[in-house]
Amino acid sequence: DFCLSRGLGDVYKRQLLSRLADRNTRGYTYAVPLVQGGVFVGATPELLVRRIGNRVVVNPLAGSAARSADPARDRTIAQTLMASDKDRREHAVVIDEVARALRPLCRTLDVPPTPEVVATDALWHLSTTLVGELADARTTSLDLALALHPTPAVCGYPTARAHEAIGELEPFARGYFAGFVGWCNVQGDGEWAVALRCAEIHDTAVRLYAGAGVVPGSVPASETAETATKFRTMLSALGLGSSVD
């Protein structure tokens, strides 16, 4: 949490959104006016679900590593992430649960056996794209988003126990963070992304949100560093540098 020297006018809000889009070309940039005033804004790399006609696409990301400006070092980081037993286990939990949620809703579902490594500007991620065909054409993109959310990537697993633990252990309310943002039209088509790397802005008050998954084998210092890297998305767009003290 911090305060700006002055509130964000409409022009600056548009500039902020433009900066986020320019610097995060591989994901989804969003800004949602809040009923209580202010705006919820961010840039997320993660597609929760897309539904166009009977085709369903889901692309969970789980398992991450900060990139390097040195090309050789950057390639090594990507290879190390792909070979990481801890990160592969974290990713598998998410994919298994997402597939379990989708199968009752799909006539067919293709689940690749292994993830791939994809890059954003700041991080490498393990990524798996699941593609299905709807069993019932009346199932909308919003229905699918509600069936999938929250995934283990943002809530943990088993879901009910993890949700209870979050309520007991996290010293703050997540608000809209780790929810989903997107659209659904009258035909049921739509696209929803996981609301990550974001901020709630009310006049001069700003609250940033970012996080990392914790599984057996996680190193607290590494997860803290990963979270700090994710904060850079909003910090740099706000013109506040890229470090978290």
Can you name each region flagged by the protein language model?
Residues 1, 83, 87, 216-223:
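Alpha-helix N-cap/helix-initiation motif
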Residues 1-12:
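Single conserved hydrophobic/aromatic residue that forms the stacking wall/gate
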Residues 59-168, 239:
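Contiguous alpha-helical scaffold segments within structured protein domains
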Residues 10-89, 93, 104-110, 188-211:
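An anion-binding catalytic pocket shared by soluble metabolic enzymes
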Residues 2, 101, 234:
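Short alpha-helical functional segments enriched in proximate histidine and acidic residues
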Residues 6, 34-40, 98-100, 115-122, ...:
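A glycine-rich phosphate-binding loop feature that marks nucleotide/adenosyl-phosphate handling sites
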Residues 135-245:
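Conserved hydrophobic core element of enzyme catalytic domains
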